[in-house]
């Protein structure tokens, strides 16, 4: 029998003395019972969805949103749903994939839930509408309903569209989650998760004289809120396909859940910008910590004022100023000052020299009295003085007048988490700085005839004073002023990449498309891929083939066509991947576009942006015509991959354990940016401690030998450290150019991790001899040594000695803290255990005829 040839293999092996055991089932059932159970479930799902389509078919809601093309008759829709259900042998994907994506709500449901939009259920108001608390009659869920019917006109509709499309695309634990929306006549409504602790300004600025039971927000919670807000902005600025500038970061837009986790909301002013890096201009004072790069953009941004006075940076008031990520950084700095001081950015109840928070704290800095800015309501001894001083210092760095001198949010996160030691960059003297808002400008000024600023009164504040706002371009000493109001001057000439229409005709027909995964017809995919022709084949992937396609004439896609469509295990993997991947959004994760289950097929549709497997570039570069992955690209791939894994482990609503991080599940786009895929084995774990621990103990080890952590193979318990181990193997593959397992070698040398660890431990080879020979010595020695060291600590046998993924990101940015504090060597006993278990695995594989 000839040895099997394969790219990789996913399997479960028997123990040394036992036989292959069947997978553990929750309950045993006969085939007849299982089939009947599936059919009964299917009829309920089909009936429910069919009824939903019948009610929505022809309705104004569906037609106006143009969310799907519904040209079929009611009967044909039901038949197609039933057909896809039977094709999947009990798996009705159309009712599951995207079930957590925003949906259309009926107006009657929201009307009943808010008691007819009762004033008693108003949570707050501002911007373009009011927010109501609602109890959904359908499932008893409490939500927040933002009613946007108070303003009319094109600008109002554009803002509604901006907020809807922005939030619908985002997936982060520190962003307010959009549940859905409703269009009813002239009323536009957005439905969000309900936040029990309301907005940060309500909690932060309450006074004991108003509420005798009031207790000020403690220091630990304040720090947690600041870190959460920083993580949200970092995600918007750097972790998406297009950069999102929020433009209205303030305490009233930071919501708090039951655990006081920060959730940034209100995306009515948000703008999408393409990433483009300009490394020519930056402040070198931040270089010692991480690469500090100034972002410029290809897409035209709004040059008109948008935001709230007190949080807007000085450059916002100049003619033709473009909003950038540094606009949000400035606003973030002001919010941090509010959190530390417990007072508003602009507060007329203070004496003249303290009305403007930023100007007052700057004067304290010049007088070396930063701690005087701390909230006097905090009990002495309840916080560390150095922590408070560092927080104020960081806030002032973020709110510097010159945007190029402000740090980016990645650097801010490092400063907040203590990822680097030492002092922060020194603050300048503010004596020569112009005042942010001179007191002379705190007077009502006439508004010019060209002013289009919209002002609203915020009911969430204890006192409300309005000022007129001038649109005239004035010197820095005459900044326009207003209080508590968002300024909505946001008309644009550029196009929003998330919209499917020309910006000049924005919402004129009330038609736009949300960019979420959808079911795609088989005929469309046949047409897109030229009937899955060999000429369109781009790669062999897990249990199938990937094809390039052009959908609807303008969307470049990759279609993964799975074989063995009758295999129950593969059907499960197919549905699992769709359900998992459709819930995530990150620039270094492959983007799911849709799926198809017609005619017994299992087709998954992705963006075409990434179409080359990392393993192919690393291990097949000896083939004529194949290019070598250069060192700079390798290092950047590892950094980006680490950010993607951190998003899965720490930044999404649930903790995601991938369980299949390999060089074969990483694809590269034309710019060598990585996209992690292969989510069929992923575990989604609640961040609730009890549920999290219970979920981790379920299941058996599944993955690719050579990448699976020793403790995971032994116990089957999925943990983040198992992913870190797999990540470490990929790092070592990048350094050495050698695959995780090489069966052409002797069995004791087949496992790359053990081989490299032994070589380094015995000092048999120099660094340049370990490096991939195809690099031709063209690499940065310090970076190569860092990656080698990182790969070794990530693949330690004891998971407690491995770094977390956040520590991995810091190491890649140049931090030595982990190595200094926890870089002890692994014991010989642990290495011996790993060696023995690996040799056992290799013997079992050879016994199965796998070479």
UniProtKB/Swiss-Prot annotation:
<dbReference type="GO" id="GO:0004674">
    <property type="term" value="F:protein serine/threonine kinase activity"/>
</dbReference>
<feature type="binding site">
    <location>
        <begin position="538"/>
        <end position="546"/>
    </location>
    <ligand>
        <name>ATP</name>
    </ligand>
</feature>
<keyword id="KW-0723">Serine/threonine-protein kinase</keyword>
<dbReference type="GO" id="GO:0106310">
    <property type="term" value="F:protein serine kinase activity"/>
</dbReference>
<dbReference type="InterPro" id="IPR008271">
    <property type="entry name" value="Ser/Thr_kinase_AS"/>
</dbReference>
<keyword id="KW-0418">Kinase</keyword>
<feature type="active site" description="Proton acceptor">
    <location>
        <position position="248"/>
    </location>
</feature>
<feature type="binding site">
    <location>
        <position position="146"/>
    </location>
    <ligand>
        <name>ATP</name>
    </ligand>
</feature>
<dbReference type="InterPro" id="IPR000719">
    <property type="entry name" value="Prot_kinase_dom"/>
</dbReference>
<feature type="region of interest" description="Disordered">
    <location>
        <begin position="448"/>
        <end position="471"/>
    </location>
</feature>
<feature type="domain" description="Protein kinase 2">
    <location>
        <begin position="532"/>
        <end position="819"/>
    </location>
</feature>
<dbReference type="GO" id="GO:0071395">
    <property type="term" value="P:cellular response to jasmonic acid stimulus"/>
</dbReference>
<keyword id="KW-0067">ATP-binding</keyword>
<dbReference type="GO" id="GO:0005524">
    <property type="term" value="F:ATP binding"/>
</dbReference>
<comment type="similarity">
    <text>Belongs to the protein kinase superfamily. Ser/Thr protein kinase family.</text>
</comment>
<dbReference type="InterPro" id="IPR011009">
    <property type="entry name" value="Kinase-like_dom_sf"/>
</dbReference>
<feature type="binding site">
    <location>
        <position position="560"/>
    </location>
    <ligand>
        <name>ATP</name>
    </ligand>
</feature>
<dbReference type="GO" id="GO:0071446">
    <property type="term" value="P:cellular response to salicylic acid stimulus"/>
</dbReference>
<dbReference type="Pfam" id="PF07714">
    <property type="entry name" value="PK_Tyr_Ser-Thr"/>
</dbReference>
<feature type="binding site">
    <location>
        <begin position="123"/>
        <end position="131"/>
    </location>
    <ligand>
        <name>ATP</name>
    </ligand>
</feature>
<keyword id="KW-0808">Transferase</keyword>
<dbReference type="GO" id="GO:0009611">
    <property type="term" value="P:response to wounding"/>
</dbReference>
<dbReference type="Pfam" id="PF00069">
    <property type="entry name" value="Pkinase"/>
</dbReference>
<dbReference type="GO" id="GO:0009617">
    <property type="term" value="P:response to bacterium"/>
</dbReference>
<feature type="domain" description="Protein kinase 1">
    <location>
        <begin position="117"/>
        <end position="436"/>
    </location>
</feature>
<keyword id="KW-0677">Repeat</keyword>
<dbReference type="InterPro" id="IPR001245">
    <property type="entry name" value="Ser-Thr/Tyr_kinase_cat_dom"/>
</dbReference>
<protein>
    <recommendedName>
        <fullName>Receptor like protein kinase S.2</fullName>
        <ecNumber>2.7.11.1</ecNumber>
    </recommendedName>
</protein>
<dbReference type="InterPro" id="IPR050528">
    <property type="entry name" value="L-type_Lectin-RKs"/>
</dbReference>
<keyword id="KW-0547">Nucleotide-binding</keyword>
<dbReference type="InterPro" id="IPR017441">
    <property type="entry name" value="Protein_kinase_ATP_BS"/>
</dbReference>
């Amino acid at each position: 029998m000839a040895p099997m040839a394969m790219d990789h293999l996913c399997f479960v092996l028997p123990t040394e003395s036992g036989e292959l055991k069947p997978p553990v089932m929750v309950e045993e059932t006969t085939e007849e019972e299982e089939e009947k159970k599936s059919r009964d479930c299917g009829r309920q799902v089909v009936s429910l969805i069919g009824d939903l389509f019948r009610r929505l078919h022809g309705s104004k809601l569906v037609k106006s949103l143009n969310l799907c093309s519904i040209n079929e008759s009611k009967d044909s829709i039901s038949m197609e749903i039933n057909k896809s259900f039977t094709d999947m042998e009990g798996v009705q994907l159309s009712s599951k994939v995207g079930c957590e994506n925003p949906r259309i709500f009926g107006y009657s449901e929201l009307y009943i839930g808010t008691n007819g939009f009762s004033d008693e259920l108003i949570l707050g108001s501002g911007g373009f509408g009011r927010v109501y608390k609602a109890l959904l009659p359908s499932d008893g869920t409490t939500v927040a309903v933002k009613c946007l019917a108070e303003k009319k006109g094109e600008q109002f509709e554009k803002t509604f569209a901006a907020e809807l499309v922005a939030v619908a695309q985002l997936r982060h634990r520190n962003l307010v989650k959009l549940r859905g929306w409703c269009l009813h006549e002239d009323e536009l409504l957005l439905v969000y998760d309900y936040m029990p602790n309301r907005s940060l300004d309500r909690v932060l600025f309450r006074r004991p004289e108003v509420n005798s039971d009031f207790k000020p927000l403690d220091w630990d919670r304040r720090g947690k809120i600041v870190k959460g807000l920083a993580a949200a902005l970092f995600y918007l600025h750097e972790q998406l396909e297009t950069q999102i500038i929020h433009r209205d970061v303030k305490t009233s837009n930071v919501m708090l859940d039951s655990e006081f986790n920060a959730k940034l909301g209100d995306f009515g002013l948000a703008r999408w910008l393409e990433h483009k890096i300009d490394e020519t201009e930056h402040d070198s004072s931040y270089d010692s910590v991480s690469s500090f790069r100034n972002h410029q953009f290809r897409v035209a941004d709004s040059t008109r004022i948008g935001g709230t006075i007190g949080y807007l940076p000085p450059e916002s008031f100049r003619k033709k100023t473009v909003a950038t990520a540094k606009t949000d950084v400035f606003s973030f700095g002001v919010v941090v000052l509010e959190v530390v001081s417990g007072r508003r950015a602009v507060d007329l109840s203070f004496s003249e020299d303290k009305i403007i928070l930023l100007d007052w704290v700057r004067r304290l800095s010049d007088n070396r009295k930063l701690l005087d800015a701390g909230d006097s309501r905090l009990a002495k001894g309840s916080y560390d003085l150095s922590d408070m001083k560092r927080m104020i210092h960081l806030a002032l760095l973020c709110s510097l007048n010159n945007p190029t001198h402000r740090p980016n949010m990645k650097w801010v996160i490092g400063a907040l988490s203590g990822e680097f030691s030492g002092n922060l960059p020194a603050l300048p003297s503010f004596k020569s700085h112009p005042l942010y808002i001179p007191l002379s400008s705190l007077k009502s000024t006439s508004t010019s005839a060209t002013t289009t600023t919209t002002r609203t009164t915020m009911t969430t504040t204890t006192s409300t004073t309005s000022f007129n706002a001038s649109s005239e371009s004035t010197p820095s000493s005459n900044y326009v002023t207003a209080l508590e109001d968002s300024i909505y001057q946001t008309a644009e000439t550029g196009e929003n990449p998330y919209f499917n229409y020309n910006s000049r005709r924005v919402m004129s027909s009330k038609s736009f498309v949300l960019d979420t995964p959808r079911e795609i017809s088989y005929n469309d995919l046949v047409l897109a891929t030229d009937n899955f022709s060999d000429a369109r084949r781009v790669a062999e992937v897990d249990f199938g083939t990937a094809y390039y396609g052009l959908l609807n004439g303008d969307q470049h896609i990759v279609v993964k066509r799975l074989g063995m469509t009758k295999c129950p295990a593969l059907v499960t993997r197919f549905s699992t991947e769709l359900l998992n991947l459709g819930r995530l959004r990150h620039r270094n994760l492959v983007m799911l576009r849709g799926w198809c289950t017609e005619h017994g097929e299992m087709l998954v549709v992705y963006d075409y942006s990434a179409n080359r497997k990392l393993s192919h570039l690393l291990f097949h570069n000896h083939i004529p015509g194949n290019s070598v992955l250069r060192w700079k690209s390798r290092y950047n791939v590892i950094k980006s991959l680490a950010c993607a894994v951190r998003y899965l482990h720490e930044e999404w609503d649930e903790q995601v354990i991938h369980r299949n991080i390999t060089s074969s599940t990483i694809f590269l786009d034309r710019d060598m940016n990585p996209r992690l895929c292969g989510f069929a084995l992923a575990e989604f774990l609640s961040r609730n401690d009890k549920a999290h621990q219970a979920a981790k103990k379920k299941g058996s080890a599944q993955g690719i030998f050579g990448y699976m952590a020793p403790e995971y193979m032994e116990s089957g318990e999925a943990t983040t450290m198992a992913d870190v181990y797999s990540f470490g193997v990929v790092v070592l593959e990048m350094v050495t150019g050698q695959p995780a397992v090489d069966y052409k070698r002797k069995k004791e040398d087949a496992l790359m991790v053990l081989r490299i660890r032994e070589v380094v431990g015995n000092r048999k080879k120099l660094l340049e001899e370990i490096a991939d020979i195809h690099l031709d010595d063209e690499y940065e020695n310090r970076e190569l040594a860092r990656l080698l060291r990182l790969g070794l600590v990530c693949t330690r046998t004891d998971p407690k000695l491995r770094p977390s993924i956040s520590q991995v990101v810091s190491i890649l940015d140049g931090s030595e803290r982990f190595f200094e504090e926890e870089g002890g060597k692994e014991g010989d006993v642990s290495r011996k255990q790993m060696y023995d278990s690996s040799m056992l695995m290799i013997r079992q594989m050879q016994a199965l005829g796998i070479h």
